């Protein structure tokens, strides 16, 4: 049997997670994306895109006040469209294990379509991820955004990890 050793890293794992979502519409894709970040409350942070693992025992909290310019580990999904009248959506879910020694799963999804379809899909993805691991779910939380494009539109959803 393989012995597990402690993780040695210069970085401490974040101990909080916050779900946020926003939308934007602008004259170009980057500004639409930026507007969606601003609406979600994380537009003045440097997002470091991470894979979909929530550190064990991380607390799910409302977005704290994070200093501008901070490097923030973030899992996110976004959908941009330039088709006027098209509806775009993005969602994120977090599955929390019953066994608090295990990590949680963060799933992100984006689509051409509505918020309900997106949120249902991202919640099912979290369930499937736990089934693949043989773990029991304590709870799943999720958030999604939806936007009907006027010029160039973006829907965005994220899980921002931070520290207490």
Curated annotation (Swiss-Prot):
Keywords linked to the UniProt accession: Decarboxylase, Lyase, Pyruvate
InterPro entries referenced in this protein's UniProt entry, alphabetically: Pyr-dep_his/arg-deCO2ase (IPR016104), Pyr-dep_his/arg-deCO2ase_sand (IPR016105), Pyruvoyl-dep_arg_deCO2ase (IPR002724)
Catalytic activity: L-arginine + H(+) = agmatine + CO2
Cofactor(s) needed by this chain: pyruvate
Note describing how the cofactor binds: Binds 1 pyruvoyl group covalently per subunit.
Database matches in SUPFAM superfamilies: Pyruvoyl-dependent histidine and arginine decarboxylases (SSF56271)
Biological process, per Gene Ontology: arginine catabolic process
Family in the record: Belongs to the PdaD family.
Identification of the protein by name: Pyruvoyl-dependent arginine decarboxylase
Annotated source species: Methanococcus maripaludis (strain C7 / ATCC BAA-1331)
Gene giving rise to this polypeptide: pdaD
């Amino acid at each position: 049997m393989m012995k597990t050793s402690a993780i040695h890293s210069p970085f401490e794992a974040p101990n909080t997670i916050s779900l946020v979502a926003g939308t934007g519409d602008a004259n170009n894709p980057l500004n639409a994306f930026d507007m969606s970040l601003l609406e979600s409350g994380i537009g003045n942070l440097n997002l470091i895109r991470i894979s979909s693992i929530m550190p064990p025992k991380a607390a799910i909290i409302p977005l704290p006040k994070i200093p501008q310019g901070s490097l923030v580990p973030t899992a996110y999904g976004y959908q941009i469209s330039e088709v006027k009248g098209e509806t775009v959506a993005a969602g994120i879910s977090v599955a929390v294990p019953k066994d608090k020694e295990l990590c949680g799963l963060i799933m992100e999804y984006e689509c051409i379509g509505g918020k309900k379809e997106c949120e249902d899909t991202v919640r099912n993805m979290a369930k499937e991820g736990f089934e693949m691991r043989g773990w029991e779910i304590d709870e799943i939380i999720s958030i999604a955004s939806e936007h009907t494009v006027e010029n160039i539109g973006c829907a965005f959803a994220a899980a921002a990890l931070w520290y207490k």
